[in-house]
A protein has these predicted regions:
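Switch- and interface-adjacent substructures of P-loop NTPase systems
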Residues: 21-25, 31, 43, 58-346, ...
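N-terminal pre-Walker A segment at the start of P-loop NTPase domains
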Residues: 2-31
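Extended hydrophobic secondary-structure segments that form protein cores and membrane-embedded regions
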Residues: 36-41, 136-139, 291-295, 349-356, ...
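Residue-level signal for functionally critical sites in structured catalytic/ligand-binding pockets
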Residues: 44, 143, 355-356, 369-371
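Glycine-rich phosphate-binding P-loop
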Residues: 37-55
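Canonical P-loop GTPase G-domain recognition
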Residues: 52, 343, 357-429, 438, ...
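Intrinsically disordered, low-complexity boundary segments flanking structured domains
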Residues: 37, 42, 105-108, 377-382
Length: 486
């Protein structure tokens, strides 16, 4: 039975690979190189604004504006391409860009659709060189869906094992759910189990945890945001109330009683349906990603303390691990599975970016430094280095890179969250010591609030005095395209 499932899984991978080849041939015939950029990160990390800023930087790039792509100039070849052929929503770039440019800037609405893509067919021209055509695709995914990627490459049993390993590191948070499972043999109903798991998810939600799986309890399959706390009783842990699942102990698989076997069968079927409808379409796109940008919400981490800080790091490790070759399939299954895994990961560059840094204001704290040290630590860097064979860039966001000393001559880091996000006057600068953790190729600023409108979208003919935020965005844009415009 296991061999048959491996054959089916391997055949599915080959079919997806065949579709990849066909799309690649189409781009070759069009003589256009495609670059797919995917921005990942937990909920509210700034993915939509980041994508809008990046696209604006590309579309408004012209020689002499203080932004040099190795003397190449970018031009839109044939207007913004739509994505209707692949049944994926179009990223509303023009709407967001116009909203940012207003006298009273409008913040983009929360991303709710399953996925949206912005296609930029660009021509790059340089004196004395043949012009180059690039189709740049940028994928936007709701932050809620990122947690579902923990199901990728996992059967229901494998996912349960993974979830309970995570549970083991935070027993106090999920103790009631584990206690219910321990006592389930005495009085078990599926409804009671689902209610116990939803109660656990609600506790995680209130702690700003990114680990809300399945994500449909917060964002329905159709992209409608839910009132999770008020609608707990009616929210389904799956595609519908008839197709629900929750993690169960691995012991249930190894020596199950009759009621446990029936439960596992139903849960596994609901899990597979959910993966096919929600997770697999995202994974199919991610398999063809060339550039990966992972955003970390510094605002959420600093205001929430060490628990959220540790969760964010583990969340980043889990997501980035999906792209690492160290995590690929091995030839222990069907031969087709192994062959497809050899071409599965194509990411050449990965970037780790800290967002919302401008909301930190003056007051001595070492939280930011600790965060940077951890995010640039050996474990996470090891995952990033396993992603691709090209340049792996791990970068942190700062407003100003400088060294400041206290009266004793010791270096200090200033970081505190302003409780008033609507504050519009300039925040005090946050200074980070020059002795930045090794491994950061360069430092960049991606800012939030009013700073997005003032710094990320300046008048493109008046950029001589670009802000650190704009300079950072320029650096990232150049890095993303450096191998194509060498």
């Amino acid at each position: 039975m296991k061999f048959v499932s491996n054959v089916i899984r391997g055949t599915g991978n080959l079919l997806r690979f065949d579709c990849t080849i066909k799309r690649g041939v189409e781009h070759i015939l069009q003589r256009r190189r495609r670059i797919r950029i995917v921005v990942l990160g937990s909920k509210n990390s700034g993915k939509t604004v980041f994508l809008t800023a990046l696209a604006s930087n590309l579309l408004n790039h012209r020689k002499g504006n203080g932004f040099d792509l190795n003397q190449w100039e970018a031009f839109v070849e044939e207007g913004l391409a739509d994505s209707h052929k692949e049944d994926i929503a179009d990223f509303p770039y023009s709407q967001y860009r116009e909203g940012f440019a207003k006298e009273n800037p409008e913040w983009p609405e929360k991303t709710t659709c399953a996925m949206s893509v912005l296609r930029l067919p660009l021509v790059f021209r340089k004196e004395g060189c043949k012009e180059r055509s690039l189709l740049i695709e940028m994928l936007d995914i709701p932050g809620e869906r990122i947690a579902d990627l923990t199901m990728a490459k996992k059967s229901y049993r494998e996912w349960c094992r993974w979830m309970f390993e995570k549970f083991g590191s935070q027993y106090s948070a999920n103790g009631p759910y584990l206690e219910y499972l321990d006592n389930a043999k005495y009085c078990f109903t599926k409804d009671d189990l689902f209610n116990a798991y939803k109660t656990y998810l609600l506790a995680e939600y209130r702690k700003y945890s990114p680990w809300i799986v399945p994500s449909v309890v917060k964002l329905t399959k159709d992209g409608k945001a839910t009132q999770f706390e008020q609608e707990l009783d009616i929210r389904a842990l799956g595609l519908s109330l008839k197709d629900q699942f929750a993690p169960v102990p691995i012991e249930w698989f190894e020596s199950p009683e009759e009621w446990q076997t029936a439960c596992i069968k139903d849960f596994a079927a609901a899990y597979d349906k959910y993966k096919e409808a929600i997770v697999d379409p995202i994974c199919d796109w991610l398999r063809e990603t060339d550039r990966l940008v992972y955003l970390v919400d510094i605002l959420n981490i600093l205001k929430s303390g060490s628990a959220v800080y540790n969760q964010e790091r583990k969340f980043a490790e889990a997501v980035l691990g999906l792209f690492s070759r160290h995590k690929s399939y091995t030839p222990c299954g069907a031969i087709w599975d192994y062959l497809s895994s050899m071409v599965k990961t194509r990411i050449k560059d990965a970037y780790l970016v800290v967002t919302k840094k401008d909301l930190a204001v003056s007051e001595t704290s070492d939280n930011l430094r600790k965060l940077a040290d951890a995010l640039l630590g050996k474990e996470l860097r090891g995952l990033m280095n396993g992603i691709g064979e090209g340049n792996i860039r791990i970068c942190a966001a700062v407003d100003t890179v400088s060294s400041r000393h206290n009266e004793s001559g010791q270096e200090v880091t200033y970081a505190k969250i302003s409780p008033d996000k609507t504050k519009t006057e300039p925040y005090e600068q946050v200074y980070v010591p020059d002795t930045w953790p090794s491994g950061a190729d360069w430092k960049m600023a991606i800012e939030d609030g009013k700073f997005w409108f003032e710094d990320t979208y300046p008048q493109f003919d008046e950029r001589e005095n670009a802000s650190p935020a704009q300079s950072g965005l320029d650096d990232l844009t150049k890095a993303l395209l450096s191998s194509e415009l060498a």
